[in-house]
């Protein structure tokens, strides 16, 4: 559990679980005699995170000081500087991923592949207010966004000597973002 005073009453605490599993397949008996296979591991994970990326005082009444003419003099005045957001909740991201780590030829060639699917709900954003309200913006939970993709990393030791080594690497990322819902 995580707590933050930045959120509305009743939403100050969030629970963000995570778990991961890995299976080092290369340690299995049926793969022990394959000399060119250095390592093979399958990974699976799920986790949630919460964001506190808002002003610490967004859910509190704030006053701004000003000056106003009263008669022939100036007086100090105070007025609300922001309108309170309604029921502000944690922006929560849940993600699962599956990955494969592969090392070949005494670990001279390494390949890492990952697929992930991420959903962020209760997105936090400033929202414009009507001018007649007397305020310009307020913070609200505005929607849900999805992000999924595939990432690949290939690394190879081209040259290895005692005092000099040359490693070549290339990566590829295919990512797609989509606004799933606005409210």
Give residue spans per PLM region.
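Extracellular/periplasmic, surface-exposed regions of secreted and cell-surface proteins
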Residues: 1-183
